[in-house]
UniProtKB/Swiss-Prot annotation:
The gene is SM20. It is found in: Tegument membrane. It comes from the Eukaryota. This is 20 kDa calcium-binding protein. Keywords: Calcium, Membrane, Metal-binding, Repeat. Ca(2+) 1 binds at D62, D64, T66. Signal peptide: none annotated.
């Protein structure tokens, strides 16, 4: 059965894989794993998550601060990672479309056009500030990492 988190759905086969990994780390068969096992569990899923992100997610699903999470909490964390990875793929696809010269960078004027089209009613000054914060070297171009940080507010 698929599992839905906000607007993201974890497919049935992904839930099964997650369940298998969860069981491996549920050493006592208590239907819970230690929050310290999240990192190794994600590595077992061939996923990389920064330790501070794992801690943040663990804190969100370990409501009573026991240091343990159940399978539902694990699935929520897994879903967040899958969503994060999908968002990055989508941004890479968008970046490739905007990278007209296929040089791994987009012109800040193209970025300005994108920001105007986001529908956030940004002023020219706000857009200028965002571009200045993104194009830190003043080259007039933005690479994918800079684009990603801007679009995800990281």
């Amino acid at each position: 059965m698929a599992f839905k988190i906000d607007d993201f759905t974890i497919q049935e086969d992904q839930v099964k894989i997650a369940k298998d990994v969860f069981k491996r780390f549920d050493k006592r068969g208590q239907e819970k794993i230690s929050t310290t096992d999240l990192g190794p569990a994600f590595r077992a899923l061939n996923l990389t998550v920064k330790p501070d992100t794992l801690k943040e997610w663990a804190d969100q699903v370990d409501d009573d601060a026991t240091g343990f999470i159940d399978f539902n909490g694990f699935l929520i964390c897994y879903g967040k990672k899958l969503q994060e990875d999908q968002d990055e793929r989508d941004l890479r696809d968008a970046f490739r479309v905007l990278d007209k010269n296929k040089r791994g960078e987009i012109d800040v004027e193209d970025l300005r056009w994108i920001l105007k089209g986001l529908g956030d009613d940004l002023t020219e000054e706000e857009i200028d500030d965002m571009i200045r914060d993104t194009d830190t070297d003043g080259s007039g171009f933005v690479d994918f990492d800079e684009f990603y940080k801007l679009m995800t507010s990281e």
